[in-house]
């Protein structure tokens, strides 16, 4: 189940990413609560807006990032991305410490961090197959999900303690420091494949990637499901602070516990994917997981019992990670090596772009209907219906 960790370079990067991801999830918890504190009754809209401005650069720049990842040393791209994100975290810590923080500053720095991720993400995703090889790629993707979701468990717990004991500054400051570990891991990578210099223009290479995806029925389906899953599913996590305050009348400690349950489920889901990756019919499993996640999200929206809500979040976290880990694996496995950076970047535009658009749309709907649970209920029903449609009609994906 951990065979990919036998590769030195992947092991170093995995450990560095785990430490950095813990810091990132600390910041996610603190930043969501910061926005609720700054914006009061408008918090649902601003949480959606923050998600939008943080992820919008994915729509704008990730395709370019994918082309660059097929032309340049991916380590250098990742290094620059991590340094920029570290600077953003430390700037937020400083602004909160001095009392100068305003909502527009949070939104601006979220956009800058998103720009860095638009170039670092394709570099990271296209580097992984070169570190472990095709045979161990599904296991590497699953392990990457495990480290990310271990951080989803550990990060909110540490954030809850840090917020209660030291305040928000500690969460942002510790996240800034955590980037040093992944930076050190990148610098320690040895004998890494560097793409050959391209003789064609960036625009032509981008067109090649788009053309390949457009003519691949399975890649089109994977890309569409990545977008739909993020658009309809991720508002569940975005609105947890609102549900904490408006439905359960609880504080940040309760919100942190909910995030921890979702993260624990996500780790369970990632471990499951590490086993599933050895089997065929990944596409069929993906559709079943998406349909199940939509159902659980609807049940969570109806729950008014803290214990039941926590249990449903655990299940939802597992199903969400299993779904997205399988879409990521399929995107990487279906892409030829020379086009992987571009193909993965197109998938990332869909997946990462679906999150801000979904957060913004769902946030606006909450302001219209006055109920975050009602919007989540609708999202769950629609997601389940779409997944079942793909499962019944096929479209080739269920046989992959």
Model regions and ranges:
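Short, membrane-interfacial amphipathic segments enriched in basic
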Residues: 1-4, 194-206
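Helix-loop boundary and gating motifs at the non-cytosolic
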Residues: 1-56, 211, 215-262
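Juxtamembrane/transmembrane-helix boundary motifs in multi-pass membrane proteins
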Residues: 3-4, 8, 41-46, 97-101, ...
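Substrate-agnostic recognition of the 12-TM MFS/MFS-like secondary transporter fold
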Residues: 9-29, 51-88, 105-164, 174, ...
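Transmembrane alpha-helix termini and helix-breaking/packing motifs in multi-pass membrane transporters
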Residues: 32-41, 93-98, 154-174, 246-247, ...
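Juxtamembrane transmembrane-helix termini
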Residues: 37-40, 98, 102-105, 191-195, ...
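C-terminal transmembrane bundle of multi-pass solute transporters/carriers
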Residues: 50, 60, 71, 77, ...
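Helix-loop junctions on the cytosolic side of multi-pass membrane transporters
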Residues: 126, 130, 168, 172-201, ...
